[in-house]
Amino acid sequence: MNKKLLVLSLAAILGLAACGSDGDNGTDGSAGTPGADGTDGQNGKDWSAVNQWFIDGQNRVATAQSLTPNNQAGAAKNIILFVGDGMGVSTVTAARILEGQLKGHTGEENSLSFETLPHLGLAKTYNVDGQTPDSAGTMTAMVTGVKTDVGVISQAEGVTRGNCASTSGQNLVTSLELAAMAGLSTGVVSTARITHATPAAAYAHAPERNWEADSNLPAEAVTNGCKDIAAQLLDFNQGKGINVVMGGGRRAFIPNTTVDPEGKSGRRADGRDLTAEWLSQYSNAAYVTDRDSFLALDTANTDHALGLFNSSHMEYDYDRVTSGVKGEPSLAEMTAKSIDILRKNNKGFVLIVEAGRIDHAHHAGNAARALHDTIALSEAVRVAMEKTSASDTLLMVTADHSHVFTIAGYPTRGNPILGLVKSNDANGVPTVTNSTDANGMPYTTVGYANGLGFASLETGGDERYNYVATAGRVDLNYTDTQSAGFHQEALVPLGSETHAGEDVAIFARGPGASLIQGTVEQNHIFHVMNYAADLVNKATAAQ
């Protein structure tokens, strides 16, 4: 292109940008008002919407230019690490679209709260002994700065999984332990069992992630002095202990002779009631088991709060919201309450928050619940962003690993993300008929590379495990694929869908956030937290 044509092209673009107005949501024109020189905004054809892409790009560049990174060591008073368990990039994309569609928009233009954070990188998730990782090894990397083996909780790769005798000298110090030693307040929140792999790695050390209660310990572990994960939470003796613990997993904290408020028995064989011990070992302590007692919790007069809201994992957020399961707080509510308790400490705090059930829904092949739990995580991050300042709080959002969850086909703009694929015709007009495979059968936009496969259930996501894996394709013409009970088809039939090995995103803001850049090893996350809050030096000085 010669200089004259280039000038004319730029003039045309800039002139076009000055004419017309964009659609109501500023991106797609499908619900827009007519532009001065545009069409009526139907089918995404409003030329003013095209102009808005250019304007939005300019605005984004201007915003990025105005950022002044704070890379001073120790500048972060507080750290909040959010982990979407199993929240790969395809899950983020699909949840973004679903949230937008639930708001009445086409969806693609939507952004989850954490997608607005200014700094972004990718993390390589493999474990020392695994190309595709598990949550124990990945979370250990994030909270200790050291990669380890599959199934191992905050211990180095020198251990043999499941062997207590191999653990001597292998414990790794976690960011939560460093914070407590430095005098900061600490908290762990999860919608999974609080003794499950991801939250456990913040405070416990074990060669086997499944040692959640003492009844899970093999004889060798007992003989060699290993403790179960729940007991380690109570025995956490750094600083003033953990200040806030909220999630599921009550059964690991109460004796097997005790029945909890849900009518379910505990799992402890040693007779210890760790909930009672929590109340006795801390002053200004509280223990809550349902949403009512949680909401009544007085944060001003509570320094140590233990909330165990389910015998096992907490409910999926879809079920909590739509199916009358009202006895549990949301992830956003737990996050807000935790911050209110922790920020009373003038030295600052470290809080780790996990959306644990994204992973579980994917394992069951139930995309709807996985995406709703991702949206719930977005709401929790939004609350944290509102309650903290980017000037003194490093806030990061990431995943421990991905899943074999795909977004496929050529669906038209705004096609229901959980629906059957409907494409555009040769003229770019959306078709009224479903796209079909080589055998003439319709297919969904989202699906899985492996797993249990198709099922259309009226019950919860985990009920899929009561049925055998479905091999091959099924005719979906008369199936409501947008129902929360629909379980997507899978290419390779397995008893459970697997994790995936691709990189996961890291979103960040606040002091040290600009150190999240490029593609990094997952253990880099710890080192950013340590640099931003100067945890090691503060902990060392406090001893």
Predicted regions and their residues:
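Short coil-to-helix leader/linker segments, especially the first N-terminal amphipathic alpha-helix
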Residues: 38-74, 112
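Alpha-helix C-terminal capping segments
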Residues: 143-145, 177-183, 387
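Collagen/collagen-like triple-helix recognition
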Residues: 20-47
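His/Cys-centered metal/cofactor-coordination and adjacent catalytic loops
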Residues: 154-169
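Active-site-adjacent structural elements in enzyme catalytic domains
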Residues: 74-102, 168-183, 190-193
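Bacterial N-terminal signal peptides that target proteins for export
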Residues: 1-7
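A post-motif C-terminal structural segment
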Residues: 52, 76-77, 87-92, 97-140, ...
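C-terminal motif of bacterial Sec signal peptides marking the signal peptidase cleavage site
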Residues: 15-18
